[in-house]
Swiss-Prot record:
A zinc finger (C3H1-type) spans 891-919. The modification Phosphoserine is found at S313, S382, S545, S591. This is Serine/threonine-protein phosphatase 1 regulatory subunit 10. Keywords: Chromosome, DNA-binding, Isopeptide bond, Metal-binding, Methylation, Nucleus, Phosphoprotein, RNA-binding, Ubl conjugation, Zinc, Zinc-finger. Residues 357-433 are annotated as: Necessary for interaction with PPP1CA. It comes from Sus scrofa (Pig).
Length: 925
């Protein structure tokens, strides 16, 4: 229809050609056209108009045509739509239309209209709609019942018509049989033979399925037989026999249970003929009575049947000859046949509800097989028996209540203690699945219920009325002496204070400054064969003072030295008596609080005292001899052998590697070692990636068992290609990428190593390494740093770009770009760009930034005191542009070093790429 509003009058005018004055559809053709218009209807007005037209139509042909064309399906669609939109008026109109249509069961099965209407009758909110839907449901139920009952009746009629001939012959047969007493017809004989043969099989099913077929005729025959048996045994009050008869009748009933209504005329017509022809009467009433008796006795099939068999077996033998004689006698009893008619009718009323037991049929067959000849006599007393049977059956059906004393029954169960059962235990998978489904449903319901719950109180708070209680009659504890005892006790003890905060927030954080633990060195003489106890340090600064009483801190250099000496074995000095390191430290430190740690490095005999501490521990090897080479023996750390070379041979490395040749100054001289860089300050295990080996450019394991990354190659070996960015000078933690120098450096004691971005540097012992980007510089034994100028190492050397400067042990090196500076041991060097510096350990660099020398990432040996760097102290000044931190001295933006925070020190110390609070950046807040 159009999109605008619809006028129903205009719509009716358009449909005027199909409708008469009352709005009823005129013809079958008109309803099909109206249906096509209904399919296009979208507005509620037009739909209601069409529904009213259908309501006005009275012709069943037109309505049936509407249903056949598809109107019922269309109404189903409209019903579904209006139900989803909850359109009550349209729903009522559709229900009225459905009630008006002549629907059948087949129509109701086509779609879910019936289901929707039933839902509306139960769950609709509108009461009128509910009533209307319930009325429609009841009407449809009546249609279903009537059609379901008429359909089998129609089928039976068809069958009966087909079998009418066979059915009509059986009543005629008894007439001919009784009169002529000759059973010449083949059909009856066959029927008798069949029960005999079928007795062994299960004929009950056959009879139950084929109602009114050939097996019916034997059912008539057994009826007679049962009747004859009753004649003989009725006086003896043989109750099971009537039951048997019922079973036989059940077979008859099985034959024709569906056509119950049709049986009544069959029963009545024979009754009318009974008066005229007496012999016809018995078989017909027996059919009806037998069927009713079977129905009455249906609920008690099993036990009674057995009893019947017991009683029947002796009596059945007698009647068989008796019946053979009295085949003509049924006429005597037939006058009573009119009597059974009324009971049969009464029973017919009971018939519809009672089911026919198929179980009894086989026994029927047994009785029939036992006495086929006795059938004629049985019908005689059948009329009387059925009444008794029905009475007995009714007695059995009566409801009896127990006596008062038996109304209650008590059952006692003794619980065995050992038979406790876990009720909550899941027995099988199905039960577990049920429990899970229930739990899921419960969770879903609670979630749905609480989804919009804001946990706000809906009920306003009402202050309760104050309770006015009378004063207590007894004061609790008035006569107690315990309160005085408690009061006396509290006078002499501290008061217990429980400070409850006003809010439940976390307490204010207490200020906590981690204090580094004091380092108490072990007695050197006693630690000969003992592995020292290594204490894990708490987070904090570097090590504390060596003496337990002193509060002053050792400089990091000395603290690391002490740790390294404690880690290794301490053999006695060459004189046989161990040197007391504690005394040397106290002599260096002086009074505990007199000097800061920087000033300690400026003492004139500082280097000598350091040598005294290091020599007995083998950290510098044995003392010098005539030709400047140490003797063999366990001089190196960890007991490594030094093989004495010839006068012109190279100095062997500490692990058996070949040492480099002597530096420019000459033979290896003693001097303090470079600072240790970690928990194991001197030696790395094999393959330590951070100290030697491939990660830092070390040349890999060498001839010795534990090749150390710092002494990777001998002084004479060519350096490997420089790895990018970082390396280690002598295996220490080298600078980061901005420094641009690194690579495997010279060993501290062994052969001169190299730094690919700096050139191989000289080792501490000997070997002339060089740093190609710095110029040749002497290690402790000699070396050079090409880009810095020839500078003296600890044993001598030079750094070309920095000017010649003296090493610790001797040799006058200089650093041309920095100015002359004095080495520690001798030889006043100069640094041209920095100004004159004085020789000895107190050379200074006027233009350098003040600070501790140990912070230099390139890390020249910290004991190679360079004197004053500006206002700084000797050996401790920052080299402003020559070294210092990679990041301008402040590493606070880097992650905090966890080793430093956990242990108090870090193996990489100043060369560590992470943030050490208070060392390479501001302390933590």
């Amino acid at each position: 229809m159009g999109s605008g509003p619809i006028d129903p009058k205009e719509l009716l005018k358009g449909l005027d050609s199909f409708l008469n004055r009352d709005g009823e559809v005129k013809s079958v053709d008109g309803i099909s056209k109206i249906f096509s218009l209904m399919k296009e209807a979208r507005k509620m007005v037009s739909r209601c108009t069409y529904l009213n037209i259908l309501l006005q139509t009275r012709s069943p042909e037109i309505l049936v045509k509407f249903i056949d064309v598809g109107g019922y399906k269309l109404l189903n669609n409209w019903l579904t739509y209006s139900k989803t939109t909850n359109n009550i008026p349209l729903l009522q109109q559709i229900l009225l239309t459905l009630q008006h249509l002549p629907l059948t069961v087949d129509h109701l099965k086509q779609n879910n209209t019936a289901k929707l209407v039933k839902q509306l009758s139960k769950s609709s909110e509108d009461e009128e709609l509910r009533k209307l839907a319930s009325v429609l449901v009841s009407d449809w139920m009546a249609v279903i019942r009537s059609q379901s009952s008429t359909q089998p009746a129609e089928k039976d009629k068809k069958k009966r018509k087909e079998e009418g001939k066979s059915r009509t012959t059986p009543p005629e047969r008894p007439l001919t049989e009784v009169k002529a007493e000759t059973r010449a017809e083949e059909a009856p004989e066959k029927k008798r033979e069949k029960p005999k043969s079928l007795r062994t099989t299960a004929p009950s099913h056959a009879k139950f399925r084929s109602t009114g077929l050939e097996l019916e005729t034997p059912s008539l025959v057994p009826v007679k037989k049962n009747a004859s048996a009753v004649v003989v045994s009725d006086k003896y009050n043989l109750k099971p026999i009537p039951l048997k008869r019922q079973s036989s009748i059940a077979a008859l009933g099985d034959a024709a249970p569906p056509a119950e209504k049709k049986y009544k005329p069959l029963n009545t017509t024979p009754n009318a003929t009974k008066e005229i022809k007496v012999k016809i009467i018995p078989p017909q009433p027996m059919e009806g009575l037998g069927f009713l008796d079977a129905l009455n006795s249906a609920p008690v099939p099993g036990i009674k049947i057995k009893k019947k068999k017991k009683v029947l077996s002796p009596t059945a033998a007698k009647p068989s000859p008796f019946e053979g004689k009295t085949s003509t006698e049924p006429s005597t009893a037939k006058p009573s046949s009119p009597e059974p008619a009324p009971p049969s009718e009464a029973m017919d009323t009971d018939r519809p509800g009672t089911p026919v037991p198929p179980v009894e049929v086989p026994e029927l067959m047994d009785t029939a097989s036992l006495e086929p000849g006795a059938l004629d006599a049985k019908p005689v007393e059948s009329p009387g028996d059925p009444s008794q049977l029905t009475r007995k059956g009714r007695k059995r059906k009566t409801v009896t209540w127990p006596e008062e004393g038996k109304l209650r029954e008590y059952f006692y169960f003794e619980l065995d203690e050992t038979e406790r059962v876990n009720v909550n235990k899941i027995k099988d998978f199905g039960e577990a699945a049920k429990r899970e489904i229930l739990s899921d449903r419960h969770a879903f319901e609670t979630a749905r219920r609480l989804s919009h719950d804001n946990m706000e109180e809906k009920v306003p708070w009402v202050c309760p009325r104050p309770l006015v209680l009378p004063s207590p009659l007894v004061t609790p504890g008035s006569n107690s002496q315990e309160r005085y005892i408690q009061a006396e006790r509290e006078k002499g003890i501290l008061q217990e204070l429980f400070l409850n905060k006003e809010s439940p927030h976390e307490p204010d954080p207490e200020p906590y400054e981690p204090v580094p633990p004091k380092l108490i060195p072990l007695d050197e003489e006693c630690s000969m064969d003992e592995t020292p106890y290594v204490e894990t340090l708490e987070p904090g600064g570097a090590g504390g003072s060596p003496d337990g009483a002193g509060g002053s801190k050792l400089p990091p250099v000395l603290a690391n030295l002490m740790g390294s000496m404690g880690a290794g074995k301490s053999p006695q000095g060459p004189g046989g008596g161990g040197i007391n390191v504690q005394e040397i430290l106290t002599s260096i430190m002086g009074s505990p609080n007199s000097h800061p740690s920087e000033e300690l490095l400026k003492q004139p005999d500082y280097s000598d005292k350091i040598k005294q501490m290091l020599v007995p521990h083998g950290l510098l090897g044995p003392g010098p001899i005539a030709n400047g080479f140490p003797p063999g023996g366990p001089g190196g750390p960890k007991g490594m052998q030094h093989f004495p070379p010839g006068p012109g041979g190279p100095m062997p490395g500490p692990h058996g590697g070949p040492g480099g040749p002597g530096g420019p100054v000459g033979p290896r001289l003693l001097g303090p070692p470079p600072p240790p860089r970690g928990g194991d300050p001197f030696w790395d295990g094999p393959g330590d990636p951070m100290r030697g080996g491939p990660m830092r450019g070390g040349p890999g394991p060498g001839p010795g068992p534990y090749h150390r990354g710092r002494g990777g190659r001998g002084g004479n070996e060519p350096p490997p290609p420089p790895p990018p960015f970082r390396g280690a000078r002598g295996g220490r933690s080298g600078g980061g990428p901005p420094n641009g120098r690194g690579g495997p450096g010279g060993g501290m004691v062994g052969g001169g190593g190299h730094r690919p971005h700096e050139g191989p540097g000289g080792g501490m012992s000997s070997g002339s390494g060089h740093r190609p980007h710095e110029g040749p510089g002497g290690g402790m034994g000699g070396g050079h740093r090409p880009h810095e100028g020839p500078g003296g190492g600890m044993g001598g050397g030079h750094r070309p770009h920095e000017g010649p400067g003296g090493g610790m042990g001797g040799g006058s090196g200089h650093r041309p770009h920095e100015g002359p500076g004095g080495g520690m041991g001798a030889g006043g060097g100069h640094r041209p760009h920095e100004g004159p510096g004085h020789g000895g350990p107190h050379g200074h660099r006027p233009h350098d930034v003040p600070g501790h020398r140990g912070h230099d990432h390139r890390g020249p040996p910290p004991h190679e005191h360079r004197g004053h760097d500006g206002p700084g102290h000797g050996g401790g000044g920052h080299r402003g542009h020559d070294g210092g931190h990679n990041h301008g001295g402040d590493m606070s933006k880097r992650p905090v070093c966890r080793h430093f925070m956990m242990k108090g020190n870090c193996r990489y110390e100043n060369n560590c790429a992470f943030y050490h609070p208070g060392v390479n950046g501001p302390p933590l807040p």
